[in-house]
């Protein structure tokens, strides 16, 4: 395995992905509609960069004026594709299978979802899927037609939010920088929330460090049997 790992990395060097659209109530809102999609599908590797919040340089993102209405308590689906122009949903249309790691999702309450950059505090994690029985969260998305299901907590306050959906690829993470962070932000108007619970929050950048065991890790050798997902715990009602 020590010999094969560099070959795996070389073959997967250009295999990237984009959170291209959001599905709500079984209806896909459209590519780039309410989601700030980039013109390039590459990763962010510097966890101290402002681009770790909602993507950005070196991957310029396109503004969108749409704010998607979502009801608290429902499950939305972040749809991932290799490129914005990718129309299929086979595993190779999502992300290279070598890109193993967790999936995560965060929310941030904002005054205006179309203008807030996402940089700074206010983020709380609402979903994570790491390593379970030898299968990674990214593998479940890749083999599930690019569908990343995210439940919106019913107990949060109504209002406008940014939804940050993320896939983390660890095939090159034995050194830092090396882990590949893929994320985009959707612009939401969440209705029907009770506001009965206030989440603890973290900042982007700031939530991850290059020394975190879930960021700097060799997933090939010795074989990984457990994995610590980076960032805070998942907020629950």
Swiss-Prot record:
Biotechnology: Lignocellulose is the most abundant polymeric composite on Earth and is a recalcitrant but promising renewable substrate for industrial biotechnology applications. Together with cellobiose dehydrogenases (CDHs) an enzymatic system capable of oxidative cellulose cleavage is formed, which increases the efficiency of cellulases and put LPMOs at focus of biofuel research.
Binding site for O2: 171, 180
Reaction equations catalysed: [(1->4)-beta-D-glucosyl]n+m + reduced acceptor + O2 = 4-dehydro-beta-D-glucosyl-[(1->4)-beta-D-glucosyl]n-1 + [(1->4)-beta-D-glucosyl]m + acceptor + H2O
Organismal lineage: Eukaryota, Fungi, Dikarya, Ascomycota, Pezizomycotina
Organism: Thermothelomyces thermophilus (strain ATCC 42464 / BCRC 31852 / DSM 1799) (Sporotrichum thermophile)
Gene symbol of the encoding locus: LPMO9C
EC number: 1.14.99.56
Protein name per UniProt: AA9 family lytic polysaccharide monooxygenase C
Cofactor: Cu(2+)
Family under the similarity heading: Belongs to the polysaccharide monooxygenase AA9 family.
Pfam families: AA9
Residues carrying a glycan: 112
GO annotation, biological process: cellulose catabolic process
Keywords per UniProt: Carbohydrate metabolism, Cellulose degradation, Copper, Disulfide bond, Glycoprotein, Metal-binding, Monooxygenase, Oxidoreductase, Polysaccharide degradation, Secreted, Signal
GO cellular component, one term: extracellular region
Main subcellular location: secreted
Domain of life where this protein originates: Eukaryota
